Amino acid sequence: MNKKTKIWLIAAAFLVVLGVVLFAAGMAAQNWDYGALGTGKNRTETYEIQGTFHKISIDSTISDIAFELSENGTCRLVCNGPAYIGFDAAAQENPLTVSETDEREWYEHIGIFIGTPKMTLYLPEAEYDALVIHEDTGDVSIPRDFRFKNMEIDASTGNIANYASVSDTMKITASTGDIRVEGVSTGALELSVSTGRVDVRDTMCGNLISNGSTGDLTLDNVIVAEKLTVERSTGDVGFDRCDAGEISVVTDTGDVRGSLCSEKVFLTRTDTGRVQIPQSVTGGVCRIETDTGDITISISE
């Protein structure tokens, strides 16, 4: 290594150390608040919503969506996020509609943006006819304080968590986000993902359909009155103390494992995987098919 190369290496190392020292000094001055690195301004806006409604429709691009039961019986929308995010909320005619818009000019997309915007909808009632949500990258969380007749949620990369019961149909679709449903009862439950994970716990429903490509499906204490239908490409399927009148599971490379609450007539097929199932001849039909995955099912005591 010649002298000139050594000088350049020493200079580069010095600049790296200097950058680290300056960064640490700057963050210490901000009490290590990484939000201070952002170039955009944040704001909190509250929208008072007048009118009577029984249906709710929300269209969001990047904001997380949360719901709360209003403590004073009024409806309002509280939004926290960058100043370039605009919101429109109105309930002059059923349904209540909430929409989000990005008000930036093209040159304002250049900058440092820290944190996730969030909208919280405070609702005066606990029961509504319908909830429809279209979400891109934000997360959606619905607490068990509410109950709906129908629910339809679709998201691209956001995660969806629902703890609210639905009397008729609950349909949730996500591309790369995860889906969690817990402690609910519903008529028909439809859950679809591309690469996300699906967790359903402590749930009762009339029918359950779950489709997915590479995401796993976990069912824990899920009771389906009629038919449980699962289709997966490479994801695993797990049951824990679950039951249904009829079960159909089809996967390509995923394993199917778990326990059921009652005996079934098992019809299984796997090309290269192993099969371990109870030798029962009574109960509803449980059909499980996989190409390279294992099949391991037991009957819980």
State what each model feature region is.
Residues 216-218, 224, 236-241, 246:
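C-terminal amphipathic alpha-helical segment
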Residues 250-252:
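Short, local alpha-helical segments
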